[in-house]
Design a protein with these regions (language model features):
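Secretory targeting signatures
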Residues: 1-34
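Cysteine-dependent hydrolase recognition
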Residues: 34-383
Length: 383
């Protein structure tokens, strides 16, 4: 009887040890482990090439996360880039704290690009005038904290600056319903995920006002080194309409601008390129070259503050409604005025047209910083 009891007890001990060993091999799930703090971001990889910053409004939305994860997979399959999602809590939602999170991550591994998702992310002011608002991404695209940019009461000062990270905004209009904004974000990431292979058709369309092109005309025409350029000075509404029947590698408009459009004719009411046109434009890359082209409308006049966008026509919002456009560059793309090239048009576009991703074409370039990127920073042409 004693021997039988000992055998039975020994068997139970062995079974218990085997059970513990089995459990130890299972993945450990913890709701708290998925909480979003800058010290414990959700990891896709320890050394990310791409960061996706989720605003407080969307950080817990599982459907948005699913769309982002599909995009992350597509980017990895296309470029081999690894990614990390970093959600932002309300109590850390200042552009300075977000900058610190980005730079801390960069110090561990050189990040190439960062997509800022959510219009409620606190963003630096680039300028405001009447009801026009212009964000600045310079604090996030540079390294060294406040030592790399100059801040005044009126916003971030634009000056020649070396870009270390490509920052792209994905900001729906503030005053739309949550479901509308959520749907917009999901559809954008879906577009970015499935449109990975874009052939360079070597056709570049440029509409430019003669009122502003003393120096930029030669810059735009120099793009002919990278493809056939169709350049029109002082275009008419008819010219704009005709252009919509064709597809292009890249499409640029340059002139006096607002968030709603660009005057591509020196005479008023002759050639107005409206942002609404982007819904039918057939190009993966669009550039609007002009003041406040990278901004939005608000219901607040000048107050030295970046106010919320209102539902209206503005370039950046069209990334969510355009079928073809993957990424936009909006702002002063051809401004120079320095002894060395510091414009987006001179430094970034030629490299983009040779097959580099937009992010890689921007990294290390010196730019004035008076433009923003909207859309997919991993966009590239298949050469």
């Amino acid at each position: 009887m004693v021997e039988g009891k000992m055998t039975h007890t020994l068997s139970r001990i062995i079974l218990t040890l085997m059970a513990l060993l089995f459990v130890s091999q299972l993945p450990f799930f913890s709701t708290h482990a998925q909480e979003t703090t800058p010290n414990n971001p959700i990891m896709t990889d320890e050394h990310p090439d791409l960061l996706i910053i989720l605003s407080p409004q969307y950080e817990k939305d599982t459907v948005i996360r699913t769309a982002i994860n599909s995009y992350i997979t597509a980017v990895y399959n296309d470029l081999g880039w690894t990614s990390r999602i970093i959600p932002i809590h309300e109590d850390e939602n200042t552009y300075q704290q977000i900058d610190n999170i980005i730079e801390t991550t960069y110090n561990n591994h050189s990040v190439k690009a960062c997509i800022m998702v959510g219009e409620d992310l606190n963003t630096a002011l680039g300028g405001d005038c009447d009801y026009l608002e212009q964000p600045s991404t310079l604090p996030w695209s540079t390294l060294g904290g406040t030592t790399t940019y100059e801040l005044t009461q009126q916003g971030i000062i634009c000056k020649p600056t070396t870009l270390n990270i490509c920052i792209s905004l994905l900001y729906p209009t503030h005053d739309l319903s949550y479901e509308q904004k959520k749907s917009s974000i999901i559809s954008a990431f879906h577009k970015f995920a499935i449109q990975r292979h874009t052939t360079n058709q070597n056709i570049i369309r440029v509409f430019e006002s003669s009122d502003l092109n003393t120096n930029s005309k030669a810059m735009y025409q120099k793009l002919s080194n990278h493809g056939d350029i169709s350049y029109t000075e002082d275009a008419t509404d008819s010219d704009i309409s005709t252009s919509l029947t064709e597809s292009y590698t890249a499409y640029f408009v340059h002139g006096h601008s607002t968030p709603a459009g660009t005057d591509v004719n020196a005479q008023k009411n002759i050639g107005w390129f409206t942002a609404e046109t982007l819904d039918t434009l057939q190009t993966p890359f669009f550039g609007a070259d002009g003041c406040y082209a990278g901004g939005w409308w608000s219901n607040q006049q000048d107050n030295n503050k970046l106010d919320s966008s209102i539902d209206g026509c503005w370039y950046g919002s069209k990334i969510f409604t355009s079928t073809h456009i993957r990424v936009m560059a909006l702002g002063l793309l051809s401004q120079n005025g320095f002894s060395t090239p510091v414009s987006f048009l001179e430094n970034v576009v030629p490299e983009l047209l040779t097959g580099k991703t937009l992010a890689e074409a921007m990294i290390g370039d010196t730019c004035i910083g008076d433009f923003i990127i909207v859309g997919d920073p991993t966009f590239h042409f298949t050469i």
